[in-house]
Amino acid sequence: MSSWITGLADKAENILNKLDQNAATALQTENATGSADPMRRSMTSSTQSLSTSLKSTLSPVRRSGANSSSSVKSDGGVSVVTKDMRQKMTTSASFSNSPDISANSMDTNELAAFKIALNEITAERDELRLRLEDLNNETEKFDLHQHTQVLEALVKSLSEERDKAVHDYNEAQAANMAYVHSISELETNLAKLQQEYISAAHKLQMQTKETEQQRQELQEYRIKAQRALQAKDSLIAELKAKPTEEGADPNLVSKDSETRFLQIEHESLKQELEHANEELQKARLQLDDYVSQERQRQVELSSARQREETLAKELRQAREHSVTSESDQRVLTQELASLRQQLSNQMAAAATRLQEREQQLQQMRQRLSEEANTGAKSDYETRLKALTQSLVERQSLLERVTSERNALRLQHEKAQTQLQQNMHLVEMESQRGSSRHTMLNSTDDVKAQFPLLMHPSPFDNRVARRFKRALRQADSMGIRVGTFLRRYPMMRVSVIVYVALLHLWVMFVLLSTTPN
């Protein structure tokens, strides 16, 4: 929009220059009849070109007027100026094109009126330029405001992302600690289960061996009993086949008694065989129980192995995460070292420039003290003011650099604390045990603030310089003591306890002693 308005102003200026040239040529010509026609033609052509240029330039300006309030105001001003210019140019054109005016009646009064109109047009042109400059300033301010808003939104989004990343990192660290603890517990449980499984397998083997031995003994006993029973059954059958007669000899009676005794033994052996069969059934049931228990132990062992595999996978992932965090930490430390190197180089360059400026300032002061000319003194005073201003700017730049150095130093300390924490976590994962560790205080955000009264100025005397130097040294010592106490909480507590004991001792001395 500003380019269109500048184009409009340039076209109006060109047209006015043409009108001035035509008026000058008309005044120089002596023949009025010959000069009226080209003057009329030039004025009509200039008015037509001005109207066309105004229309062509105002149309995009009016279209862009709906975008912002500032553009609307500028279009209003431009439209008013263009209306005035049109009216004046139409009056001048009608004045030139009127049929009543002839070539003989144009005189110096009309030319003077034409010059007055030209002067008014030039004044309006200047006013249009001023409005154009104001409009450009407003547009620049508006662009700067929009740019600042965009930057503020970007800073806010970046701060939110940083907070979110810190929160995610803390959550991941807590989850990692929980995983390490659970892994250690599961490993202990797995070792216990393995020991129990080994002991149960050993017991099962012993019991299977005992059952096999008992089974073999039972089979041998069964075979022997069956043989004895078969022999006795055959003997009983023979005795039954040959019954004894009455009045038989006593040998047969003794044999009958032996057969009865053998029958009794046969019945007892049958009972023992039944008892042995019952014991064999019990042993079989126990063997089945042992087999089922062994199957259950195998199922538990397979589940424990699956758990062990999952835990091993989680442990690998945790180790990979720790390795990535260590690599990120190394990259951050390298970047921090490079930034510190750049900062030290900038500080050295600024210090050398400051020394050069101070030397130049001293040379200028010597020259001012030597010379007595007032004009030279005023010139030197202006130079001295410029040098002092540049010196103040250099000092402010040096202060900014020192503040950035302190911020980078704090970032370095935070990175070191994070690196120590990550190394401690890696050691805990390698040892597979939980151990407590103390974290350093990373809230050391002290920034060196330099009061305005302590700034050295070139107009200070020696006493003021020494006093300000002493104040700066005392301020730096106080800042160092404050950072030391913030960084080490035990020293802070010890100092507080020492001050409290000192006050108690002083109160005890004051209350216990009596005046003479």
Swiss-Prot record:
GO biological process, any: intra-Golgi vesicle-mediated transport
Membrane topology (Cytoplasmic): 1-492
Lipid bilayer topology: Single-pass type IV membrane protein
TM segment ranges: 493-513
Entry's localization field: Golgi apparatus membrane
Main location, first listed in the record: Golgi
Any one GO CC term of the record: Golgi cisterna
Keyword annotations of the record: Coiled coil, Golgi apparatus, Membrane, Phosphoprotein, Transmembrane, Transmembrane helix
Coiled-coil segments on the chain, per record: 108-423
Lumenal side: 514-516
Protein name: Golgin-84
Annotated spans, Disordered: 28-80
Pfam families linked to this entry: Golgin_A5
Gene: Golgin84
Role summary: May be involved in maintaining Golgi structure and in intra-Golgi transport.
InterPro entries noted in UniProt: Golgin_subfamily_A_member_5
GO molecular function annotation: cargo receptor activity; protein homodimerization activity; small GTPase binding
Record field: compositional bias (Low complexity): 42-80
Modified positions (Phosphoserine) in chain numbering: 64, 74
